[in-house]
Curated annotation (Swiss-Prot):
Annotated family: Belongs to the UPF0441 family.
Top-level taxon of the source organism: Bacteria
InterPro entries: Biofilm_formation_YgiB (IPR009576)
Stored Pfam families: DUF1190
Official protein name in the record: UPF0441 protein SG0265
Length: 215
């Protein structure tokens, strides 16, 4: 019996240590802690531009502009890149593409003026950080009829955040706001669309349980 008590105590200490080390950032802004949901989920808002953000949040006008400008800079680094305008337009539609400006963060061989094309930033995701301030990520959308990103907000990794409607709020994994790796190589026509389609499939297979649990 004494030995059994010792084993139980050891098990209790093990579980207590695991609990003590669990992340404490479970309530950032309006985060909902739901059974079965990721512990790092948080609320974000999606806007097409800083004006939409400022109208929805008059007291945060400066933060809206700062986040928008930062998202634009991030878009240049992380957006999918194409070797020609035609390849970009095929995926995103007319008036949706621009030449990639040369910048220090990209490989030297990729900095030739006009050598690559990228989609224009269609909006941005904005969320409050635990340490104060706001974090952001650029969002893109497609006007191409056959694109899985048509009329949707997607990030540089192809993750879909629903209709490209400004002013929406939603709960996302904190990883959605994490910095994305710079894109310095071009992709083939249709490559980004395939990525979006795969992300959509993953989302449909994993999001339903999260939505139903906890109401």
């Amino acid at each position: 019996m004494k030995r059994t008590k010792q084993i139980n105590h050891a098990s209790f200490r093990k579980h207590w240590r695991a609990y003590r080390m669990a992340p404490v950032a479970l309530a950032v802004g309006a985060v909902f802690v739901l059974a079965g949901c990721e512990k790092s989920d948080e609320n974000v808002s999606l806007y097409m531009n800083s004006d939409d953000c400022a109208r929805a949040n008059p007291s945060l006008s400066e933060q809206c502009t700062t986040a928008y400008n930062a998202a634009q800079q991030e878009a240049v680094k992380t957006a999918p890149k194409y070797a020609s305008r035609a390849d970009c337009v095929a995926e995103f539609g007319e008036e949706q593409c621009t030449q990639v400006p040369a910048q220090a963060g990209m490989a030297a061989e990729s900095q030739h003026s006009g050598s690559m094309w990228m989609p224009l930033m269609a909006g941005y995701m904005m969320g409050r950080m635990m340490v104060g301030g706001y974090s952001q990520q650029p969002l893109f959308t497609s006007l191409a009829a056959n694109s899985p990103a048509r009329g949707q907000f997607v990030d540089a990794r192809g993750r879909n955040y629903g209709a490209s409607t400004s002013g929406r709020s939603m709960t996302v994994p904190k990883t959605a706001l994490a910095p994305k790796p710079a894109t310095t190589q071009t992709i083939t026509r249709g490559g980004f669309g395939e990525t979006v389609a795969k992300q959509n499939a993953l989302r449909s297979s994993s999001a339903t349980p999260h939505r139903t649990m906890g109401g």
